[in-house]
Amino acid sequence: MKLNLSSKIVLNQIPEEFYHPATAIERSEITRFEKVPTDIFPTIEEGAIDIANQLEEGIKKAAQEGRKFIMGIGSGSSLTPIFQELIKRYEAGELSFKDVVIFNAYEYFPLNAENVNRSINQLKGCFLNHIDIKAENIYTPDGTLPQDEVQEYCRQYEHLIKELGGMDVILLGIGRMGNIATNEPGSSLTSTSRLILIDETAREEMKMSFGSQETVPPCSITMGIETILSARKIFLTAWGEEKADIIKKTVEGKVTDAVPASFLQTHNDAHVVIDLPAAAKLTRIQHPWLVASCKWTDKLVRSALVWLCQITGKPILKLTNKDYNENGLSELLALYGSAYNANIKIFNDLQHTITGWPGGKPNADDTYRPERANPYPKRIIVFSPHPDDDVISMGGTLRRLVQQGHDVHVAYETSGNIAVGDEEVVRFMHFINGFNQLFGNEQDEIIKEKYKEIKTFLQSKKEGDIDSQDVRIIKGLIRRGEARTASTFNQIPLDHVHFLDLPFYESGKIEKLPMGEADVNIVRNLISTIQPHQIYVAGDLADPHGTHRKCTDAVLAALDMEKEAKAEWLKDCRVWMYRGAWAEWEIENIEMCVPISPEELRAKRNSILKHQSQMESAPFLGNDERLFWQRSEDRNRGTAELYDKLGLACYEAMEAFVEYKV
């Protein structure tokens, strides 16, 4: 069973010479915009192996010289693959850590020693407890100290690092704002170990470990920028497209305290190690024509022309030979013969992505349409990771599919219960208790007992506590009720609304259980029963909580099993990926774009508003202060505006899709 097929999705095939150049000259040419040596790998595993190789070499060299290897490390999730690779080598007898000294880069403050979320406890759990490092060789800032003793402790911590000869290497991840260790934007180049306040953005990232933002300690004791730069070698790692923007600022931007990681540009042996998704915004990956000759695919040509339109402020059909020549795209003139020919080609390609018939237009020529005309009507399943992702991400298309006569099913993959606030439970419990008093003559003792039990639990609940099973069930029921209301509003029969309640989600915590066979079998059973002609799945693979990726992996695994079983229905099924909750598709990747009128956009907003528990009081709105309906409308309007600026038809809004080839 293949449980990670989403990681195999490659929208843009990057030629190897742009991330793994064969010679030093080629590397120098394609990295001309980069100010920190940056190594890009196709997968996280390959990047982790590369760093582990260099660490192993350093550890063994230090042992041969009869000295200890001094290593600074952080505790972010981006370092876990490297730790796993090092553990594997220790278990295979290839590497020993007896002569390695570890300095923890930061610790939360104040936090008691037993708390599992302490940085050092996380490091022990994922790395240190699995190797043969001596306990006396592990040093960490102390988050249990009285505050008035912290400054002196930091001074001693700095002194100890220097006394042992300084760090041979420090291994760090990077935060969304460019923070390294917990040095936030504004940190000085000359800063040393100190107590600092954790800002809101960093707290948002840390809540994945702590369960909620409120339980993240207010401060941390961190190595300073000067301390980090004192290491003889620095590795900075990042994986995934959600880190692409900050990696570009770190590697290609100017040195600024607004991006603390950019200070690595001043170090003589700093290395950024990333995977292809994290490298997506670097010039050699996003705009390769600016650094070398390209193998021009249709997608790359489309990307180049959209970029050219944006920097010239012109629509596609007004681009001239001069525009191409002045902006590094003369190769396209040689390829197409003239700007006119290239313009027409890409204009037509984009025009053909637009359709008002997402299920296919019956009895019409579908040669240039993204979806086939037949069969009609189609059986369709829209998979929604949470009970509101369907309307947030493709509410206009969903409504259009129903109105155009297709047999539409919606499958809500998870209960979404942890995203419901406690006050919603209290409100519904008041209603149930009141209903019992009014119409049941208070005869139902179960309701009375449960009311008291749940009320007592919520009153005594502390920040970070996991909800009881009863509370999670009620929260799930609230989400189900909202999903049914929205589906009814969109004219979807309730017998076409399926609640899958995939088991991986039911951990009661932000961090979910591993997605496995039980999840896939639930999805496969639904798919094989309905045998759809169209499937819609979430393509927001960088969502901050990981639920979308796991849900999509479950669907793709189920489809792969059906393919292996040679299911006949699969030959006439297309799979479309949507986005919208956290990001939008890049225009070069869009294969179907559905226009939305002002009235349809209003209806989409109303269907999102049916999910009342996900408005202002929802626990996990992320860093974006806009409500989900506002984010959705802004993205849909942004897509329409981009098409308009390129010289195509002007619509109120548009929803975009990319096809997944089974």
Protein language model annotation of sequence segments:
Residues 82-93, 390-415, 419:
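Histidine-anchored nucleotide/phosphate-binding helix
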Residues 13, 22-35, 95-169:
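Ligand-binding beta-strand-loop-alpha-helix segment within the catalytic cores
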Residues 63-92:
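Glycine-rich N-terminal segment of FAD-binding domains in flavoprotein oxidoreductases
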Residues 2-70, 366-367, 374:
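N-terminal glycine-/serine-/threonine-rich phosphate-binding loop
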Residues 203-211, 215-220, 312-381, 400-404, ...:
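Metal-dependent de-N-acetylase/amidase catalytic core
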Residues 176-198, 251-254, 549-558, 591-596:
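Short, surface-exposed, charged loop/turn segments at secondary-structure junctions
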Residues 181-225:
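Class I SAM-dependent methyltransferase SAM-binding "motif I" and its flanking Rossmann-like core
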Residues 2-12, 25, 226, 230-330:
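ATP/nucleoside-binding phosphotransfer catalytic cores, i.e., glycine-rich phosphate-binding loops
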